Amino acid sequence: MNRRDFILKTTGVAAASLSYSQLYAQIQKQVEPTSNQANYDVIVLGVGSMGASTCYHLAKRGFKVLGLEQFDIPHELGSHAGQSRIIRKAYGEGSDYVPLMERAYQNWQALESETGSQVYYKTGLAYFGAPDDPFLSTVLGSSKKYNIPVNNLTVEECDRKYPQFKLPQNFQRLEEPEAGFITPERSILLYVQQAIFNGAVIRTKEKVLEWRHETSGSVTVVTDRGTYKAGKLVITAGPWAAKVMPSLASKLTVTRQAVAWVKPKKWDDFTLGKFPCWILENKEYDFYGFPILPVGTFGGPLGLKLALHYPGADTTDPDFVNRKTKESDEKILIEFLNRFIPDGYENTLVMKTCLYTNTPDHNFIIDYLSEYDKDVVFATGFSGHGFKFVSVVGEILADMAMNGSTPLPIGFLNAKRFDKAGI
């Protein structure tokens, strides 16, 4: 039995019936402990969220792909962990993202169809904020420009539909019915599974020591376990991007973020099906959260998840992050819950940290490293709002690496936009 048939027999579309822990265990068996092959069409440096999707899109097109990940897949040391990520189309960060988001929805649905496993859950998304809030204004602008359904709820309608929230009378109350959440760890595992099924080699716990562009136009990657060559290199290194690409260091800042899972006073009122995903804009701080999810399906932790979206938080080095949360991290979330979701807090169950890789304008960077022609392509700087785009970023990077361009509209995300500002 060949490798492809073995993988199909042992996993195939059976992912639909697997719990998160079962899927995780199966994927670990498929990851290559060793590889005698040294030459590839393309090497993907970093197999987190964007890298997993890229490996899949490249392998599905028939290219010889090597994915290198310094940690396990998935892991909790970067930006992709944490059980759930909001997905939405009426984009408050700018309407230029909407065409990419529409393609991302299509690609998420394609992954579900291929694997028989659900990754997108439509819960609806509630947006709350002041009448003049710029983020909500852009949400409405994106909705109007691209005909995305967004409901403007009255106070009475909101109180009936979302009685868990206690909001100022003058707050805007918006609802995007088609929004919801994506399961990050399951999505990454499924992309890795499908990449391997299509012939990719994925190696974990293998740290890249250096990479170099040869005069011949090829790329050499040296790790702590081997040396590999390829015609193209894709860098999706998350918070480690500036360490792998020092020329981008002035454009990237890594910050430490805190996420909480809490026990609400009325547990049943906050479970999946009774409570939405939500975003609340409150002048200096932006908060977001999710319903309580069953850990058997989604993995842990268990509890009502919420976090502060604050790209200007503590800067850090990804190799030396203080993973212990501070009292102030918890305090601001408790104060928020007591003010806006009165029954949402009884006690804290779990606090975790994750990392943002921020750009000066908080928009992504997807481009070529200009000094290497088009042999090295990268994606970075997702600034805390990137995971929903994983399914389309992988497609874009595959296009750029192997075709020299992508038909998808990413001109606003190129690195050259910072040159005018001298960054």
Locate the predicted segments by residue:
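Glycine-rich FAD pyrophosphate-binding loop
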Residues: 60-79
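Dinucleotide-binding Rossmann-like beta1-alpha1 core, especially the glycine-rich loop
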Residues: 84-161, 170, 286-287
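N-terminal export signals
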Residues: 5-27
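Active-site substrate-recognition segment that forms the wall
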Residues: 56-60, 118-121, 227, 239-374
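Flavin (FAD/FMN) cofactor-binding and adjacent substrate-gating region
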Residues: 132-198, 203-204, 210-217
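Core beta-strand elements of the Rossmann-like FAD/NAD(P) dinucleotide-binding domain
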Residues: 38-40, 223-232
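Short hydrophobic core segments
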Residues: 45, 228-239
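C-terminal catalytic lobe of FAD-dependent flavoproteins
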Residues: 339-423
